């Protein structure tokens, strides 16, 4: 893989999760453009720099030796990537503190460097949280590849920071410069809430939760076919989002024990709050993690999963395949993985390579619900 070469450092970077023969690099031209701009403008060792949505630490690791840098993302994998890439390039793994996007920031910051996220609600929430966190004369610069830069990103910067000027495109990347202005303090529109009829629950969703304004159609197809009569089974909701699958299952299985896992800190925050609102003090484990990567082998009886098919702007089934492998390792012999997936993704064939038996539980014109037994 090529090195990220900037005026600040030459770095050998890896993506997360790691894959053999990884076809994609851990940085892009928008990272390079942003680093070059910071170097041309000038950065002092005393500067406090906040980096938002740095996918694998390309920006934060480049600047770590040149200023006081703090990174904030909504991704456990991004936080893990930052640590690994710092260590991989001869720095302490904790040289740059990482603050989950679900937690408050602590300024003042002289620079705010933003990689525009796929979910603009996350950007909006991050900009709202910047209120009162900027030092006098602070510089706020957002970067993206042109094909992933909607006009509304600039509109949000203008609404919450100040006037915006766009750069020329360089290597198909563009920068947005926002000049901070005094603003009326704004209240966040997040979290959002919606109600379900079956089960009759209300769900809260922080800004970066998938389908935060209503139940996604895959989950809606899955809910009627969640397993019942689980007794004291140990159940994991893998990629839990707002926790709806686990909560619905727990209502039907009052003695079962649940673990909810997602790589999004805001998803985990939403799931924990929804569990408490619906199930009170019933014991549960909710954690941000790389799926079931750290789950003890043979420690689960059932895994529920509505697998994602994209990581930011990268689309593919590599995350689903990884989840299936993790589920197989964590399940006891005879345990079962239940999933919902689009018909065209061919999950039945993939699961048949990993599990002893795969059966179709139900189907709709668009989705299939599958049960794979270890």
From Swiss-Prot:
Cellular component terms (Gene Ontology): cytoplasm
SUPFAM superfamilies from the xrefs? S-adenosyl-L-methionine-dependent methyltransferases
Q: What's the EC number here?
A: 2.1.1.174
Entry keyword set:
Cytoplasm, Methyltransferase, rRNA processing, S-adenosyl-L-methionine, Transferase
GO MF entries = 23S rRNA (guanine(1835)-N(2))-methyltransferase activity; nucleic acid binding
* Reaction(s) catalysed (UniProt annotation): guanosine(1835) in 23S rRNA + S-adenosyl-L-methionine = N(2)-methylguanosine(1835) in 23S rRNA + S-adenosyl-L-homocysteine + H(+)
User: InterPro entries in the record, alphabetically?
Assistant: DNA_methylase_N6_adenine_CS, rRNA_m2G-MeTrfase_RlmG, RsmC/RlmG, SAM-dependent_MTases_sf, Small_mtfrase_dom
**What does the UniProt entry say about where the protein is found?**
Cytoplasm
What's the domain of life for this entry?
A: Bacteria
Q: Which residues form the signal peptide?
A: none
Please classify the protein's predominant subcellular localization into one broad category.
cytoplasm
What does the protein in this record do? Answer: Specifically methylates the guanine in position 1835 (m2G1835) of 23S rRNA.
**Could you say which protein family the record assigns here?**
Belongs to the methyltransferase superfamily. RlmG family.
What name goes with this protein? Answer: Ribosomal RNA large subunit methyltransferase G
The species is: Pseudomonas savastanoi pv. phaseolicola (Pseudomonas syringae pv. phaseolicola)
């Amino acid at each position: 893989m090529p090195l990220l070469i900037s005026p600040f450092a030459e770095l050998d970077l890896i993506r997360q999760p790691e894959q053999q023969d990884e076809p994609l690099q851990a940085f892009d031209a928008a990272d390079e453009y942003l680093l070059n701009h910071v170097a041309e403008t000038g950065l002092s060792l005393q500067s406090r720099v906040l980096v938002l949505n740095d996918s694998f630490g390309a920006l934060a690791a480049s600047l770590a030796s040149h200023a006081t840098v703090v990174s904030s993302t909504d991704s456990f994998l991004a936080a893990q990537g930052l640590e690994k890439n710092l260590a991989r390039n001869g720095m302490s793994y904790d040289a740059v503190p990482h603050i989950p996007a679900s937690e408050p920031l602590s300024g003042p910051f002289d620079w705010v460097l933003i990689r525009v996220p796929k979910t603009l609600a996350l950007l909006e929430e991050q900009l709202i949280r910047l209120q009162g966190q900027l030092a006098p004369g602070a510089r706020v610069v957002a970067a993206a590849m042109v094909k992933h830069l909607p006009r509304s990103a600039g509109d949000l910067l203008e609404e919450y920071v100040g006037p915006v000027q766009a750069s020329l495109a360089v290597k198909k990347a563009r920068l947005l410069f926002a000049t901070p202005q005094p603003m009326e303090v704004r209240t966040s529109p997040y979290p959002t809430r919606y109600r379900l009829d079956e089960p009759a629950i209300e769900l809260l969703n922080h800004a970066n939760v998938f389908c935060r304004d209503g139940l996604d159609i895959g989950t809606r197809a899955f809910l009627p076919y969640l397993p019942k009569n689980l007794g004291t089974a140990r159940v994991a909701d893998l990629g839990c989002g707002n926790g709806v699958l686990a909560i619905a299952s727990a209502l039907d299985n009052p003695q079962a024990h649940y673990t909810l896992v997602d790589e999004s800190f805001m998803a985990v925050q939403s799931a924990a709050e929804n569990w408490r609102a619906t199930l009170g003090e019933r014991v549960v484990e909710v954690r941000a993690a790389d799926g079931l990567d750290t789950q003890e082998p043979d420690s689960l009886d059932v895994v529920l999963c509505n697998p994602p098919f994209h990581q930011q702007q990268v689309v593919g089934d590599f995350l689903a395949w990884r989840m299936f492998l993790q589920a197989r390792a964590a399940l006891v012999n005879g345990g079962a993985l239940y999933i919902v997936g689009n018909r065209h993704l061919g999950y039945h064939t993939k699961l048949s390579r990993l599990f002893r038996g795969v059966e179709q539980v139900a189907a709709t014109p668009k989705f299939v619900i599958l049960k794979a037994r270890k």
